[in-house]
């Protein structure tokens, strides 16, 4: 009997604590003005650094603004590490994701680790953009996106791509030959996405490429190999194609998973001859 009364008493105390907690939260909510709750931005406001602000531009040149970042795929969220963190849920992240993609007065966007595409796409199109999205591999859960502005703007807007290519970086060696199975022994499932976007008004356009290179910090050789494949692909557009768009400016933006002191960066910026010995020492350690 005593044990039964103890359990009842504990249950009543728990219920009372829960009621008081609910009352407190309702009082706080009621005392907060609606405008304060509704005006909270989806993303933090940040100041951007202006670069090349005073560079002379040809009179008939077009200016475009491109943003690029890794979206951090929802499919890669480790909820078991943060079981109480509701900020990792898609319904919480989604407004911020869309705001970051569309609210920086950008004309173009290159994004990596994009998934939940059915949830993101309607908001992107409503904001005046269209996009192409590719995973490259059926078993891969996230992919690359190139986004362009379609709504009238004081700068550039774009029509749908006149050309698109997806390159599976595992399937091509650095000299351009197709390989039987993954190149060397790494299976990375990394890809390159390229589109040729014509301007909505007037002649010309822009070729936009994005990629997400191999992530592991120990394997610099694989990143350098993938970068070589990418540069060969982009260079071949100039040499092989007879299309008008092949002469358009090319922009490569993406997540290279690397740093400015790396061999990959040195190779991409044309400094290989100056640092040949250092590059060889760095890359041979991770070559398979």
Language-model segment annotations:
Residues 36-59, 63, 108-215, 219:
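Structured beta-strand-rich core segments of catalytic domains in phosphoester-bond hydrolases
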Residues 73-75, 214-217, 260:
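Feature marks short, surface-exposed loop/turn motifs that line or immediately flank catalytic pockets
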Residues 218-288:
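Metal-dependent phosphoesterases centered on the DNase I-like endonuclease/exonuclease/phosphatase
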């Amino acid at each position: 009997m005593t044990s039964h009364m103890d359990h009842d008493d504990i249950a009543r105390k728990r219920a009372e604590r829960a009621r008081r907690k609910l009352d407190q939260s309702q009082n706080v909510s009621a005392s907060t003005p609606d405008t304060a709750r509704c005006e909270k931005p989806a993303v933090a406001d940040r100041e951007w650094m202006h670069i090349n602000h005073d560079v002379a531009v040809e009179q008939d040149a077009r200016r475009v603004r491109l943003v690029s970042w890794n979206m951090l795929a929802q499919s890669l969220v480790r909820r078991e590490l943060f079981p109480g963190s509701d900020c990792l849920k898609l319904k919480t992240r989604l407004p911020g994701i869309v705001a970051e993609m569309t609210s920086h007065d950008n004309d173009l966007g290159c994004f990596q680790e994009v998934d939940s595409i059915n949830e993101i796409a309607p908001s992107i199109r409503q904001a005046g953009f269209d996009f192409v999205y590719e995973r490259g591999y059926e078993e891969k859960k996230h992919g690359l996106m190139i986004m362009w502005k379609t709504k009238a703007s004081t700068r550039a807007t774009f029509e749908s791509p006149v050309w698109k290519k997806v390159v599976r970086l595992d399937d091509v060696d650095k000299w351009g030959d197709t390989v039987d199975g993954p190149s060397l022994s790494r299976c990375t499932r990394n890809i390159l996405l390229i589109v040729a976007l014509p301007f909505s008004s007037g002649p010309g356009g822009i070729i936009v490429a994005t990629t997400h290179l191999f992530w592991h910090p120990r394997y610099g050789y694989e990143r350098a190999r993938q970068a070589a494949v990418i540069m060969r692909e982009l260079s071949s557009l100039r040499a092989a194609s007879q299309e008008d768009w092949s002469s358009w400016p090319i922009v490569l933006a993406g997540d290279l998973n690397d740093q400015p002191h790396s061999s990959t960066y040195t190779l991409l910026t044309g400094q290989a001859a100056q640092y040949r010995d250092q590059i060889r020492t760095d890359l041979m350690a991770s070559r398979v």
